[in-house]
Amino acid sequence: MAEESPRYAIVTGGNRGIGFEICRQLANKGIRVILTSRDEKQGLEAVETLKKELEISDQSIVFHQLDVSDPVSVTSLAEFVKTHFGKLDILINNAGVGGVITDVDALRAGTGKEGFKWEETITETYELAEECIKINYYGPKRMCEAFIPLLQLSDSPRIINVSSFMGQVKNLVNEWAKGILSDAENLTEVRIDQVINQLLNDLKEDTAKTKYWAKVMSAYVVSKAGLNAYTRILAKKHPEIRVNSVCPGFVKTDMNFKTGILSVEEGASSPVRLALLPHQESPSGCFFDRKQVSEF
């Protein structure tokens, strides 16, 4: 019997948190993992840690530097994968930022206390909002565009966009944006851009306008709502690829200063499940809240 050909996965933001654990779980299942991160030192250390822990070979997991907000960096990774592996089976867009400044002491002191308003511990700036959109929305979009040709060479291609329940349309206060992003039939990338540009224009004029967009973390909410909308567009455009977004749950990570409820193992299990589902059993164009299909 012919040996099964290896399956290859890229995980962005793989040096820590949920991304690191996704890499661990995939490698443990025999998937060959390309762990990526902006920070080369941290990425290389993460790969060495996993090789020792899982007792796997140099071929089982490799590191490649990646900044999803930099087109040159994305192209460099695509060339690397094409040259060394010839195809891609799984793309997990996990890299992301919160887009806010957090008063960590106040957050830790208040977490779990009755009447605590965590939104009062954070501050949004235009610069952070812009970076958040670049990384959380345009980053995955750029990755998908670069890797679809390599995914099309797989017999079981899938894209998993790690999103958030905060990106559900119901969390938008702006009715105009809500209308555009919930209109599945007429969704286009241009319309998503219009929503994003309007948010950034509003924040550039006055950061207080954030309250017209979401109750809290407006750039983060819009970036994830945009990512969910793009997931639907991509699934329709490429029926041969299983494309889904997933909220891993409120996980203890560096992004929320370990105030989450779930462990990274629990959080990573949801994107990993979607990555490994048999092709014929895998839905496409869905938003998952952990392991359950939910509304966009």
Curated annotation (Swiss-Prot):
It is an enzyme of class 1 (oxidoreductase). Keywords: NADP, Oxidoreductase. GO terms for molecular function: alcohol dehydrogenase (NADP+) activity. Its EC number is 1.1.1.-. The active site is at residue 220. NADP(+) binds at residues 16-40. Substrate binds at residue 164. Induction: Not induced by pathogen infection and not detected in healthy leaves. It holds the Pfam family adh_short. GO terms for cellular component: cytosol. CDD domains: carb_red_PTCR-like_SDR_c (cd05324). SUPFAM superfamilies: NAD(P)-binding Rossmann-fold domains. InterPro entries: CBR1-like, NAD(P)-bd_dom_sf, SDR_fam. It comes from the Eukaryota. Aldehyde reductase that catalyzes the reduction of the aldehyde carbonyl groups on saturated and alpha,beta-unsaturated aldehydes with more than 5 carbons. Belongs to the short-chain dehydrogenases/reductases (SDR) family. This is Short-chain dehydrogenase/reductase 2b. It comes from Arabidopsis thaliana. The gene is SDR2b.
